[in-house]
């Protein structure tokens, strides 16, 4: 047999053997060989493919890593929308869900359920054609996500080719499988240790780490992050039909896709609640983070009969865990200054572990919130991760006070620039009005360079601080005058890093109107509103000349947003900034209309906000939802469609539950905004 034929036969044998061991390791959790033996097989395959490059195929295990970094993510449309789930926070709500299911199904027989741990990761959809992985996308807004195919192929838990040799049916001609990419606790801790040693910012939790790792423009970064995945369902399928959710999971497992081994068929809703209690009791001992249990009607036929509501299926519910809480001490209260000049008090805490995550600080929102909760320096407090993600101070332990606690008072001068701090009558926040405030300049630069704005890679927090503190950059327009020689003078900024940043800044000159408008940081103009304006007016000049009435004629743009845009372009300093950017050579391509019904969730809905939001003011949140076609109301009634609940929401949430109104916590609210 010629050498090439021998090599071909050995390559095929090695690929099949490696796929087999991947299946045993990632799906069955029963490895048969040591890591060293596996590495030996992999290295042999690499050597053979290097010797015979014509024999390399896209589904080879060696092809997971190596693609060049992309400049941006392409859209990934979902043929069947990836809906979110209705939440339940109590047994009563789960039993009510089961009652609704039985009412719709009538006397068709006893209903059994599939109960699955709710992974706290990033939702993804993988597309396999004739068994080979051809596409992968994030959930996005449920209709269109981001194409992360190249990155998904670097995750060893995701098979490049579905495994048909473990029994059961062969893979269909085309199937879209859905699941969660996650990072387990051990790998998360190791990643943060390495980032701390390198002087890089730490990830707040494993979910953020997983999302940030998958959504990398450079696949080699994703490959180095030890991501894993569990799969729980399917979207589009051709030529194949599943009978039950349990069968779906088993068949996915047989094809080589990891499924959560803790999932269980429950003959009754009472059994599903018992499963929840069992999982909740042992959640901290699991190697990965979960934030609840998803309960699904097991029969696929009955799922189809039950159908969907506008945002969620009627046949499933997410029974969420109560937030983790822990006791700690307030060491200090520091004030942060944002890009719009808002001063936000932040509690510096004695490090405490809350739900597997070390919490060192928590936002206190504003002076009113500090006074309402009476939070003082050196207080003993209870801290929780709201939505199991955002740290917040729940309450002060009053009986632990010794008399040595200090009352917090918002400073009269900006901690960054020393300018007078003001509180406008209609706002709950204090502001620094100095446009030359270093903290605001730094925050504006980070916003301008962010992925959804000018997308300048390499312009991180540390380099921004050095540029501003040394007086090299005083405005975003100064970025376009940076040279390699200037950057090389900064400590730790080697030649390659300097060249890469200058090249990234140069690439950002080719942008579009929507991204540019968002990058300017106009009050109330998020990325979605910026796109609406770009699609309606087409050019920057047209937006600058538009009146309040003309802006309000855009569907999704209200009076608050319109006046903010007009005010921005009326200020001489802003007009000078825009002209400086244009003079630097920025070129704006036409903005294409958005793909898919991205406003379907908010459009026409009546929304009520209650409680404090940590990520923005309620007025900003109201403006964002209004810009998407929603109507914001102050009171809950039968006409209310959605209640957004922040910290300490009060009676509105209970009334919403009684009326069966959809309730979103802050994390879900941000996800629905695509933030």
Curated annotation (Swiss-Prot):
Zn(2+) binds at residues 414, 417, 432, 437. Its EC number is 6.5.1.2. Gene3D superfamilies: 5' to 3' exonuclease, C-terminal subdomain (1.10.150.20), 6.20.10.30, BRCT domain (3.40.50.10190), DNA ligase/mRNA capping enzyme (3.30.470.30), Helix hairpin bin (1.10.287.610), Nucleic acid-binding proteins (2.40.50.140). DNA ligase that catalyzes the formation of phosphodiester linkages between 5'-phosphoryl and 3'-hydroxyl groups in double-stranded DNA using NAD as a coenzyme and as the energy source for the reaction. It is essential for DNA replication and repair of damaged DNA. GO terms for cellular component: cytosol. SUPFAM superfamilies: BRCT domain, DNA ligase/mRNA capping enzyme, catalytic domain, Nucleic acid-binding proteins, RuvA domain 2-like. NAD(+) binds at residues 35-39, 84-85, 116, 139, 180, 296, 320. Residues 597-675 form the BRCT domain. It is an enzyme of class 6 (ligase). GO terms for biological process: DNA repair; DNA replication. This is DNA ligase. It comes from Syntrophobacter fumaroxidans (strain DSM 10017 / MPOB). Belongs to the NAD-dependent DNA ligase family. LigA subfamily. Keywords: DNA damage, DNA repair, DNA replication, Ligase, Magnesium, Manganese, Metal-binding, NAD, Zinc. Its cofactor is Mg(2+); Mn(2+). GO terms for molecular function: DNA binding; DNA ligase (NAD+) activity; metal ion binding. Pfam families: BRCT (PF00533), DNA_ligase_aden (PF01653), DNA_ligase_OB (PF03120), DNA_ligase_ZBD (PF03119), HHH_2 (PF12826), HHH_5 (PF14520), Nlig-Ia (PF22745). It catalyses: NAD(+) + (deoxyribonucleotide)n-3'-hydroxyl + 5'-phospho-(deoxyribonucleotide)m = (deoxyribonucleotide)n+m + AMP + beta-nicotinamide D-nucleotide. The active site is at 118 (n6-amp-lysine intermediate).
């Amino acid at each position: 047999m010629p050498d090439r034929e021998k090599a071909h036969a050995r390559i095929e044998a090695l690929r099949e053997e490696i796929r087999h061991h991947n299946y045993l390791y990632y799906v069955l959790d029963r490895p048969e060989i040591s890591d060293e033996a596996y590495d030996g097989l992999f290295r042999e395959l690499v050597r053979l493919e290097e010797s015979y490059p014509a024999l390399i195929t896209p589904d080879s295990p060696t092809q997971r890593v190596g693609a060049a970094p992309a400049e941006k993510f392409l859209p990934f449309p979902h043929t069947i929308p990836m809906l979110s789930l209705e939440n339940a926070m109590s047994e009563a709500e789960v039993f009510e869900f089961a009652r609704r299911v039985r009412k719709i199904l009538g006397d068709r027989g006893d209903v059994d359920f599939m109960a699955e741990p709710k992974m706290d990761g990033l939702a993804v959809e993988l597309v396999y054609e004739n068994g080979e992985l051809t596409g992968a996308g994030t959930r996005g807004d449920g209709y269109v996500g981001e194409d992360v195919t190249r990155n998904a192929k670097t995750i060893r838990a995701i098979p490049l080719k579905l495994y048909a040799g473990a029994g059961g049916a062969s893979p269909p001609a085309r199937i879209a499988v859905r699941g969660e990419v996650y990072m387990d606790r051990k790998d998360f801790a190791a990643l943060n240790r390495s980032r701390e040693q390198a002087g890089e910012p730490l990830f707040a939790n494993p979910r953020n780490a997983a999302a940030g790792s998958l959504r990398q423009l450079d696949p080699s970064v994703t490959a180095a992050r030890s991501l894993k995945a569990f799969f729980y369902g399917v979207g589009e399928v051709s030529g194949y039909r599943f009978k039950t959710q349990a069968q779906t999971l088993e068949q996915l497992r047989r094809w080589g896709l990891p499924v959560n081994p803790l999932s269980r068929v429950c003959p009754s809703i009472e059994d599903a609640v018992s499963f929840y209690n069992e999982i909740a009791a042992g959640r901290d001992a699991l190697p990965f983070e979960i934030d609840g249990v998803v309960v699904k009607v097991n029969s696929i036929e009955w799922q189809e009969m039950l159908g969907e509501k506008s945002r969620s299926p009627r046949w499933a519910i997410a029974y969420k865990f109560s937030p983790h809480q822990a006791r700690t001490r307030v060491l200090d209260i520091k004030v942060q200054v944002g890009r719009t000049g808002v001063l936000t008090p932040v509690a510096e805490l004695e490090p405490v572990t809350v739900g597997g995550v070390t919490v060192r600080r928590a936002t206190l929102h504003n002076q009113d919130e500090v006074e309402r909760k009476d939070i003082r320096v050196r207080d003993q407090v209870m801290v929780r991760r709201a939505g199991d993600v955002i740290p917040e101070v729940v309450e002060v332990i009053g009986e632990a006070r010794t008399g040595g606690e200090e009352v917090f008072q918002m400073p009269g001068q900006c901690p960054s620039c020393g300018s007078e701090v003001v509180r406008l009558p209609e706002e709950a926040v204090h502001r620094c009005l100095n446009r030359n405030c270093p903290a605001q300049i730094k925050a504006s630069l980070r916003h301008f360079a962010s992925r959804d704005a000018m997308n300048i890679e390499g312009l991180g927090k540390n380099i921004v601080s050095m540029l501003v503190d040394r007086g090299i950059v005083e405005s975003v327009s100064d970025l376009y005058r940076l040279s390699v020689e200037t950057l090389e003078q900064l400590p730790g900024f080697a030649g390659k890093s300097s060249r890469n940043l200058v090249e990234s800044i140069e690439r950002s000159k080719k942008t579009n109107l929507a991204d540019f408008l968002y990058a300017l940081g106009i009050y109330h103009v998020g990325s979605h509103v910026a796109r609406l304006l770009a699609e309606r007016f087409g050019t920057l000049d047209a937006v600058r000349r538009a009146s309040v009435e003309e802006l309000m004629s855009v569907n999704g743009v209200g009076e608050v947003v319109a006046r903010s845009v007009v005010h921005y372009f009326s200020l001489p300093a802003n007009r000078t900034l825009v002209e400086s950017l244009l003079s630097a050579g920025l070129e704006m391509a036409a903005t294409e209309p958005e793909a898919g019904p991205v406003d379907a969730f908010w459009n026409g809905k009546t929304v009520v906000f209650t409680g404090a939001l940590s990520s923005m003011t309620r007025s900003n949140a109201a403006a964002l939802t209004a810009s998407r076609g929603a109507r914001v109301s102050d009171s809950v009634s039968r006409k209310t469609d959605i209640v957004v609940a922040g910290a300490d929401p009060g009676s509105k949430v209970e009334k919403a539950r009684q009326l069966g109104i959809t309730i979103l916590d802050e994390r879900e609210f941000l996800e629905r905004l695509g933030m």
